[in-house]
Regions:
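N-terminal secretory/targeting leader peptides
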Residues: 1-179
Length: 179
């Protein structure tokens, strides 16, 4: 089933990661959340236990989901950043020279990973379209983002210390809408 707007999810059983936040996310989008381990998704899709799943392009191709599911919607309901985490004691223990080397190395790693990911996604999309015959859909993302607002509000209400981080993310998103 092509998903062009949240209401298209009504009545569909969609695999989500096993977390209360992801279950609530799917409920707000109008679908029926089906928490399930990733290893069971292919069989569940094949058996009709699931109507769909949310995942990236590599899961679509590398795990064979595109052999069964013929639509992939870029609705941007969830964006998962990749993070590099470092201990403050480690960072603060570096000399100025070591810190400069570390930061230069980080930029190299970041660029290399980003390029490799973009290449892998392009290859996966090519395979999905040309071998698995998957149709990629680019719906208006605003309705999906609007549907997530209550989830954002509830998470922020329960964790007010996250508000400054959330605000910075929103500012970044507003400044980089074409990214």
């Amino acid at each position: 089933t092509p998903i062009n707007q949240p209401s298209d999810l009504k009545g569909l059983k969609i695999r989500v990661q096993q977390s209360p936040t992801n279950v609530e996310m799917m409920r707000l989008l109008g679908g029926t959340a089906t928490p399930m381990g990733f290893g069971d998704v292919y069989t569940a899709l094949q058996a009709g236990i699931l109507d769909g799943a949310e995942n990236n392009e590599l899961a679509l191709t590398d795990n064979g989901h595109g052999d069964i599911c013929k639509y992939y919607s870029y609705d941007m309901h969830q964006m998962v950043p990749d993070l590099l985490v470092a201990n403050y004691a480690f960072l603060n223990g570096l000399s100025d020279e070591e810190r400069a080397i570390f930061e230069e190395g980080f930029q190299i790693v970041k660029s290399t990973e980003q390029d490799a990911w973009e290449d892998a996604v392009a290859e996966a999309k090519d395979k999905a379209e040309n071998e698995q015959h998957v149709n990629f859909i680019y719906p208006d993302t605003a309705p999906f983002q609007e549907a997530m607002a209550p989830l954002h509000d509830s998470v922020l209400a329960a964790n007010p210390e996250l508000q400054p981080i959330y605000d910075r993310i929103q500012q970044h998103n507003a400044a980089h809408t074409a990214d």
